[in-house]
Amino acid sequence: MNILPISAFFLLYLGHSLAQENVCNLPVDEGVCRALFKRFYYEPATDSCKEFYYGGCEGNGNRFKSKKECILKCQKNKQLIKTRKRKPKKTTKPPIPIISLD
């Protein structure tokens, strides 16, 4: 049995996994272009996701379209995700007043 293909696959998988984990430790990078896309980056020192403006090209992987995406990917204390509570929909119409002429 040739173990080389299995070893190569394992090393590629391991490298990919480590690269995925390390994006959270990269510094914020606005990129070199001048667009203003609102994005979020993870700041390890405060274990929080913060807003910044991305220029639209280059930069690094520590860039998320939403704060929730950043939190789910990087933040250690994930309980800080706030869920919006929906107000219950009114499904009944208000009662129609009945006038009695007795």
Swiss-Prot record:
GO terms for cellular component: extracellular space. PANTHER family: BPTI_KUNITZ INHIBITOR DOMAIN-CONTAINING PROTEIN, KUNITZ-TYPE PROTEASE INHIBITOR-RELATED. Residues 24-74 form the BPTI/Kunitz inhibitor domain. Disulfide bonds join C24-C74, C33-C57, C49-C70. It is found in: Secreted. Residues 1-19 form the signal peptide. Belongs to the venom Kunitz-type family. GO terms for molecular function: serine-type endopeptidase inhibitor activity. It holds the Pfam family Kunitz_BPTI. Transmembrane segments: none annotated. Salivary gland (at protein level). Not detected in female carcass without head and salivary glands. Not detected in males. Residues 83-92 have a biased composition (Basic residues). Keywords: Disulfide bond, Protease inhibitor, Secreted, Serine protease inhibitor, Signal. SUPFAM superfamilies: BPTI-like. Interacts with mouse, bovine and human coagulation factor X (F10) (activated). Interacts with host elastase. This is Simukunin. Residues 83-102 are annotated as: Disordered. Changing K38A: Does not affect anti-coagulation activity. Induction: Constitutively expressed in female salivary gland; blood feeding does not affect expression. Salivary anticoagulant that inhibits plasma clotting in the host. Strongly inhibits host elastase, coagulation factors Xa (F10) and cathepsin G (CTSG). Inhibits host plasmin (PLG), kallikrein, trypsin, beta-tryptase and coagulation factor XIa (F11). SMART domains: KU. CDD domains: Kunitz-type.
